[in-house]
Amino acid sequence: MSIQAPPRLLELAGQSLLRDQALSISAMEELPRVLYLPLFMEAFRRRHFQTLTVMVQAWPFTCLPLGSLMKTLHLETLKALLEGLHMLLTQKDRPRRWKLQVLDLRDVDENFWARWPGAWALSCFPETMSKRQTAEDCPRMGEHQPLKVFIDICLKEIPQDECLRYLFQWVYQRRGLVHLCCSKLVNYLTPIKHLRKSLKIIYLNSIQQLEIRNMSWPRLIRKLRCYLKEMKNLRKLVFSRCHHSMSDNELEGRLVTKFSSVFLRLEHLQLLKIKLITFFSGHLEQLIRCLQNPLENLELTYGYLLEEDMKCLSQYPSLGYLKHLNLSYVLLFRISLEPLGALLEKIAASLETLILEGCQIHYSQLSAILPGLSHCSQLTTFYFGRNCMSMGALKDLLCHTSGLSKLSLETYPAPEESLNSLVRVDWEIFALLRAELMCTLREVRQPKRIFIGPTPCPSCGSSPSEELELHLCC
């Protein structure tokens, strides 16, 4: 029978302070730092809003990582803390103990709260905090430095979440005193006018990851280009299912030119993903030549590109060090793959992931990319399913992977010889051909995880992935 440990003296002292909110408020200025975190956590748990309002005004650390304590924002708690910050920001003479530079509403630092109570007496905080934060994120707090509020934002619908709407209004009313910093911003279904309102409030230089979904390309370019140009610290830029209904190729070209000029300002961009790439067909070079920083990840998926678009991929230094290249479901069967082969040769020393699934590549085109592919010594993932391959072409492809010792996940289509007149797999024939392909592969190297066959699996509907056992269910 276990005996519950008695409360520590620190815990008892904190509980005593919280019994009388007036007493705890008057004691904040002189409260030992070792008591501050347990007392704050207890006030937070009991929702003593008045105590929280005062505690934030005397916060003795450079950062208050509230998001890791409050997984889901609670409106009344947020109001109490922001009220305390408002009272503080409007004072000419701030409390001598106040060191707060950052209110972090992201779920990023659980360790901060796990270190109480004893560890705080031994730690030299905020020196330990400074190791975790960069100068860019938390500059030295001078008299006129704005308070930084960090949050990741996902705009899904209108009306917005109550907490987010309140926070936006609070920051807007304190322009110059507060910077709303958003390292990750995702826009799903919010109308463009509401997204623009949000961008007017957010400190644009803080955005490192931006994802925009389901918008019209012409409206996006006309309405958001001026904001994108100011996101100078952007690392990841994703456009998913942005559409267009234009038939004027000349007008499309002018819009792409305007849009491409944005990339002249994005000197830290590492990932560019465009799902539904057809809008850039015939104009892709305008975008690629404006890229300022060598990309690590390029994803141009779903749609079609012209041969001139493919040629430009190997001609600019910004794509010379790619680690991840995804061209899935870009229809390539009508164009020469020599430009793609040239790109693979160029990035062979760095490429780790290559996804060419669903490109409808014909076996007659395959020879153009095999030399480049065979030199990709760092390749760990290769998706090549849903392409039209003969048995001979697949054997040739597998033999050209003999030097790719780091390959740990690879997928290939069923050979066309295993398909019947209805273009469906004849499983009896397929089993024999698959065994022959595996025998060919094992003669040159030992595969780790490999999937050969139609995707998704006709039995269970699954597609191969990192989480899926790579075998046919049938």
UniProtKB/Swiss-Prot annotation:
Species the sequence originates in: Homo sapiens (Human)
Protein's name in the database: PRAME family member 14
Alphabetically ordered keywords of this record: Leucine-rich repeat, Repeat
LRR repeats: 15-38, 204-229, 271-294, 319-342, 391-414
Listed GO biological process terms: negative regulation of apoptotic process; negative regulation of cell differentiation; negative regulation of DNA-templated transcription; positive regulation of cell population proliferation; proteasome-mediated ubiquitin-dependent protein catabolic process
Family, per entry: Belongs to the PRAME family.
One Gene Ontology MF term: ubiquitin-like ligase-substrate adaptor activity
Domain of life: Eukaryota
UniProt-listed InterPro entries: LRR_dom_sf, PRAME, PRAME_domain
CC terms in the record's Gene Ontology section: Cul2-RING ubiquitin ligase complex; cytoplasm
